[in-house]
Amino acid sequence: MKLSDFDFDLPSELIAQYPSSERDNSDLLIAVTPPIKTKFYNIIDYLKEGDLLVFNNSKVIKAQLNLGKNITINLNQKLSDDSWSAFAKPARKLHVNDEFYFDNHKVIITEKLAMGEIKVKFKLNDISVFEFLNKYGEMPLPVYIRRSHSLCHPVATTTGSKTYLNNDWIPWSNHGMTNTQNDNDRYQTVYSQIEGSVAAPTAGLHFTKDILDKLKAEGIQATFLTLHVGAGTFLPVKTENIHEHKMHTEYCSITPDTAEIINKAKQEGKRIIAVGTTTLRTLESSCNNGIVKAGSFKTDIFITPGFKFQTADMLLTNFHFPKSTLFMLICAFAGFKEMHELYKYAIKEAMRFFSYGDATLLCRK
């Protein structure tokens, strides 16, 4: 199939710039004929006792660092305890061995790669990289969230190739609350546990603790796996022949308990509902002859129409970009023609797209 087969017209005003007023107040589109548009807090009406929801419990880290000199880096993947790959903007301003100081901590540029990718090393005093990021980093919002300058930026002092940043902040805010304060909460699922993602597994953003409690009370099970979402999730497909596209790799983990719960539910004929494309990709990557295997691994699975699914019966997901690998995935899962028609309906109904947008519940075709 061609890349152009997965294109559709999306009005820019439907790209959600902010989350809904409450997590579960977003819209939910049930992919039946005709489609049913409801509120997410009604999702329990479309599930049944014995269903198994599989969630991605990865936690978004504050992966964006402002280095001063109008340079920003977004961490991508952990390489070792003190080294990460990252994307720099603009990368041309950086050189190998450049050092950036955050109080008494140091970030060193160790390698420059193609397409703005770099490698960095953290020299920290008595704190972990995640603790450092919690103090100095910002939530890494996707590039399509374009707001006015309302984020906080650090004060920087530059001496030669060394830049010193302190913990003073210049606040610019249109809402009485900086965007980072709100995003720190809303760009994170309520059940996130394991730090490592640089973008949110967004299908889970709609769930509240109250909804999770109600699902449990109705006999709807839940279990958790981990996929750390990398920055590559936003990379566009640039080849017209989609099968020439090279997927990014991401770290995944499934515990023995989770694998046992999923396999038992499958054996008993219970419905498996993947919450998000990250969950579905992890399940399919781990599955061998219909059995989900426990373990930690990296995946670069690229799911396109014709793929033979072995795990989930349903998929809860947000609305995706035209010509994206995730739109290709849902076309593979729920039907090429059906998804184009569903998206036309969603656009007509002015549903909100992408990370802070609305959700849809799909059945496997």
UniProtKB/Swiss-Prot annotation:
One Pfam family it belongs to: Queuosine_synth
Transmembrane segments: none
Documented EC number(s): 2.4.99.17
Gene Ontology CC terms, in alphabetical order: cytoplasm
Annotated coiled-coil segments of the chain: none
Pathway: tRNA modification; tRNA-queuosine biosynthesis
Biological process according to GO: queuosine biosynthetic process; tRNA wobble guanine modification
The reaction(s) this protein catalyses: 7-aminomethyl-7-carbaguanosine(34) in tRNA + S-adenosyl-L-methionine = epoxyqueuosine(34) in tRNA + adenine + L-methionine + 2 H(+)
InterPro entries associated with the record: QueA, QueA_dom1, QueA_dom2, QueA_sf
Molecular function per GO: S-adenosylmethionine:tRNA ribosyltransferase-isomerase activity
Keyword set, alphabetical order: Cytoplasm, Queuosine biosynthesis, S-adenosyl-L-methionine, Transferase
Subunit structure: Monomer.
NCBIfam families: PRK01424.1 (NF002398)
Biological role stated in the UniProt entry: Transfers and isomerizes the ribose moiety from AdoMet to the 7-aminomethyl group of 7-deazaguanine (preQ1-tRNA) to give epoxyqueuosine (oQ-tRNA).
Family: Belongs to the QueA family.
Name this protein carries in UniProt: S-adenosylmethionine:tRNA ribosyltransferase-isomerase
Species whose genome carries this gene: Rickettsia rickettsii (strain Sheila Smith)
